[in-house]
Amino acid sequence: MESAAFKAARSPQDFLPLTPLSFLVLMVLADRDSHGYGIIKEVERRTDGSTRPGTGTLYTALQRLTDDDLIQEAEQRPDIGDDSRRRYYSLTALGRQTAQLEAERMANLVGLAIDSDLLPHTAGSSHGES
């Protein structure tokens, strides 16, 4: 078990690279608090169905993200009329910083892939223009 002092000293870089599912969860929670099923549906929507996390996989990721203080159980329920058994999650400040660093890391990798002609050229790119 980690001491509170060790956990408090952790920085966003300590969690990089994130797993794809962890990054997707943090992105969903960056927009709004959500419960597990809502996170699953939003991940499916954002990835056009290419990522469909199973409930066991998602809840394992949620537990790990909670243990790492990247997310927490939300203090308030966004929908008061919702099923009281649902646990809502929210992004912590550390979670937001970690997601931002991961996005920057991935953007740099995509830039390298474009430079290596591994991705189609994007509009406005200087590659291939005459």
List the predicted regions and their residue ranges.
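Short beta-strand/turn micro-motifs at beta-sheet edges
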Residues: S11-F15, E75-P78
